[in-house]
Amino acid sequence: MFTLPVVTAHSERPDSATVHALLSSMVKAMEISANGKIGPISATSVSQLSCPGGQSDDPYRCTFLCAGCYAEGNMQGIHTRALNTAIPLVIAWATAEDIATYEALALDALTGKRPCRLHVVGDCKNANSARILSQAAARYTAKHGQVVYTYTHGWRQVSRDNWGGVSVLASCDSQSELKQADAQGYGCALVVDHHDDSKLVPLADGFQGIPCPEQVGTKENCKSCGLCMRADWLKSKKLVILLAAHGQGVKKVKASLKEKASND
């Protein structure tokens, strides 16, 4: 079972060199990702401490955190565990803004020659951290005009305008959440049990779902598809990207979806 590291040490914020070493270990940037789904684009990943629910006092916990998140299984899980290693040493003092600042530094170090998937692992759970990364994304795009895109479970606490020019989709777990996320200014992605085919799917409140083209085989990867890089356009058309449960924790995800649907 995937779990976040047990907190065994609490301390005051250490000296700046130690802070730098610890926070740097919680961030990774790739000029060209080896992730087959997103394709040969740039990407960043950060510790799950940045996710809603990564700390006990977070007001909302991501449904899939330590409960089937795709980032916790298979080869990706190895990288995620590495990013989480320092959690016991920083949780007493590290803030969401700290992690976002170090992810921004990692983003700044990339060439900007390719589209960039922001935090394949990780999230922004408050407005300040989203603004820090939106500014870094603007610098990234200014280099060669390439888009920075991502998904967020933090949409309940962070309105869309804090993300600036980032193409960001609200990660929703039920159809009832689509209207709420839309009201926050977001285009949406919805996790579903499975895809029947590649056809548009009617959803609640006038939304329509597009089965992820990579998952249904009509596009090779995210780079060749590009739909999630057009989040505001998707919102304007009330189109929702449907992402079928996948990864090593797929059974847990499907169980969570079923439970959430029964409570709607």
Outline where the language-model segments fall.
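Class I S-adenosyl-L-methionine
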Residues: 1-264
